[in-house]
């Protein structure tokens, strides 16, 4: 509800040609949203964003500050990059109160980002090549180089990403449209859905509810659960992400009966991860 964010959303809503969906503007994982949300004075946003990008770039550190660059995949994560035109979007930057001049030079993901000797560790400088965002790197490493191929990575949450080829695709079902990478002069795009609670569900079962001692117990408990159980769990501890984007949603359990026990509850919690991933994949298919 920060006024800077509300102002940006209002301006972006009038610029439908930019391809920015409202749920993306609300997504705190985007850098522009986080920076605006932290600032009390709009004129400080550009300065703070420039420093945040500089500190966060491995390239800048590797080159001793000689290069201020990012690749296309990381640029797309700022919410300030025009995904269709392949450049910093002046209208979006203006909406967030950010000067495009403070943003890094965008380089092909397999391009030359500079030279490094690792702070004098190497006898001679070597070129820095191959820069990707984390989810994009996982997509590439899993061999999803063709349209229609997808990956799901699991950690605290989960990222489900699908390669949609060399043409921009705007999701109508709550997914984020983004860039996969730009290599050999060819840009490829993705659809992505992020789930907030995946592995964190098992951590919650262990640390907060103390229903398990370690995640390995979950499989045995799932097999031990009553197969007729119809318990369902929604891990909306911080709302729901893609494809629902319901920030006011709360966690809940359905279908508990007198015979519901530890095994049935743990199974429902474990299955909630799969159901969330299914929702994202179903949105991709649609």
Identify the meaning behind each predicted range.
Residues 108-112:
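Gly/charged, well-structured mid-domain segments that form the phosphate/adenylate-handling core
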Residues 1-53:
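Intrinsically disordered, low-complexity segments enriched in glycine and mixed charged residues
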Residues 69-74, 103-105:
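Conserved alpha/beta enzyme-core scaffolds, especially Rossmann-like or related mixed alpha/beta domains
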């Amino acid at each position: 509800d920060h006024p800077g964010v509300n102002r940006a959303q209002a301006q972006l809503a009038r610029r439908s040609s930019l391809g920015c969906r409202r749920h993306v503007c609300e997504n705190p994982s985007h850098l522009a949203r986080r920076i605006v949300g932290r600032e009390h004075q709009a004129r400080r946003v550009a300065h703070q964003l420039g420093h945040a990008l500089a500190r966060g770039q491995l390239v800048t550190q590797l080159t001793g500050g000689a290069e201020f660059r990012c690749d296309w995949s990381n640029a797309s994560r700022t919410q300030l990059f025009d995904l269709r035109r392949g450049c910093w979007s002046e209208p979006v930057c203006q909406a967030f109160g950010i000067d495009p001049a403070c943003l890094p030079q965008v380089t092909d993901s397999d391009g030359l980002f500079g030279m490094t000797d690792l702070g004098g560790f190497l006898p001679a400088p070597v070129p820095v090549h191959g820069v990707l965002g984390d989810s994009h790197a996982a997509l590439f490493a899993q061999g999803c180089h063709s349209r229609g191929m997808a990956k799901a990575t699991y950690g605290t949450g989960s990222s489900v990403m699908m390669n949609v080829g060399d043409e921009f695709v705007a999701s109508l079902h709550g997914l984020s449209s983004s860039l996969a990478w730009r290599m050999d002069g060819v840009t490829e795009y993705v659809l992505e859905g992020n789930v907030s609670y995946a592995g964190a569900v098992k951590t919650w079962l262990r640390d907060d509810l103390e229903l398990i001692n370690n995640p390995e117990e979950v499989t045995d408990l799932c097999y031990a659960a009553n197969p007729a159980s119809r318990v369902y769990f929604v891990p909306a501890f911080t709302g729901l992400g893609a494809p629902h984007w319901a920030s006011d949603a709360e966690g809940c359990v359905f279908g508990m009966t007198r015979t519901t026990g530890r095994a049935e509850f743990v199974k429902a919690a474990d299955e909630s991860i799969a159901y969330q991933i299914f929702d994202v994949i179903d949105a991709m298919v649609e």
